[in-house]
């Protein structure tokens, strides 16, 4: 029996479609574990075993990811050539949403990151938030650094590194901010008018903090403290 060319074409299309990875929402991607959600952010802790890959998943919102530990990752964005990323511990990047991809861990150790979606990204594009007093710059501290990395969608990202005993000088948070622990942290926050409060965090821990206060932050641990802050208006 001879098969018609049209029938063979249909069969080929069915096989091709079945071979393509189905697209899932980020909330259904099993390597993305929801850690925190509020009107400002949706935060996922991501862990990918050596040589493993995520499902094809969609990023609908602009987001920042914070790398935990060195890694090498292949980024396969749908409709674009593959790209290889060599990442260092604490590397923090912003990516605009609206794409679908697969991430593959090319290294021999787990790929870990914290992914923070900006839930008000569309609002920020339509009505840009106020400018920050400073949007880029490195501050050298006594025993540490404060590096303002970038401002995206009105959110200011900074990396803080404090050696044991070092203090981040007094500063004011008018709005809320998110803390992402890159290293384990043993810190003390001294809020003006309230006194000192201890903070104990493991690497990858996140904490949402309200605004409306001034404080200093001291590393009271025995090792370097590294963390990322995302500040909101």
Regions picked out by a protein language model, each given a short descriptive name:
Residues 57-59, 101, 171-173, 215:
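Histidine-centered divalent metal-coordination motifs
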Residues 1-5:
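Positively charged n-region of N-terminal signal peptides that target proteins for export
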Residues 20-45, 49-53, 75-77, 81-159, ...:
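A short, N-terminal "cap"/entry segment at the start of jelly-roll beta-barrel domains
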Residues 60-78, 173-193:
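Glycine- and acidic-residue-biased ligand/ion/polar-headgroup-sensing regions
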Residues 64-67, 92, 178-181, 206-209, ...:
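Active-site scaffold segments
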């Amino acid at each position: 029996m001879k098969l018609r060319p049209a029938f063979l074409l249909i069969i080929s299309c069915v096989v091709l479609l079945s071979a393509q990875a189905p697209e899932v929402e980020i909330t259904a991607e099993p390597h993305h574990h929801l850690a925190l959600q509020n009107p400002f952010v949706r935060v996922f802790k991501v862990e990918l075993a050596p040589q493993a890959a995520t499902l094809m998943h969609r990023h609908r919102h602009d987001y920042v990811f914070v790398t935990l530990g060195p890694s090498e990752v292949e980024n396969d964005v749908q409709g674009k050539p593959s790209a290889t990323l060599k990442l260092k511990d604490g590397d923090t990047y912003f990516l605009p949403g609206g794409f679908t991809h697969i991430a593959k861990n090319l290294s021999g150790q787990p790929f870990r990151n914290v992914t923070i979606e900006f839930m008000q990204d569309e609002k920020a594009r339509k009505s840009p938030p106020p400018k920050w007093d400073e949007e880029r710059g490195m501050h050298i501290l006594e025993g540490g650094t404060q590096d303002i990395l970038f401002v995206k969608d009105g959110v200011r990202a900074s990396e803080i590194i404090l050696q044991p005993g070092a203090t981040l000088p007094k500063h004011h948070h008018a709005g809320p901010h998110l803390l992402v622990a890159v290293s384990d942290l043993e810190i003390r926050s001294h809020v003006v008018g309230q006194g000192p409060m201890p903070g104990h965090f493991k690497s990858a821990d996140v904490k949402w903090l309200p605004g409306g206060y001034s404080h200093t932050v001291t590393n009271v641990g025995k090792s370097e403290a590294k963390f990322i802050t995302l500040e909101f208006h």
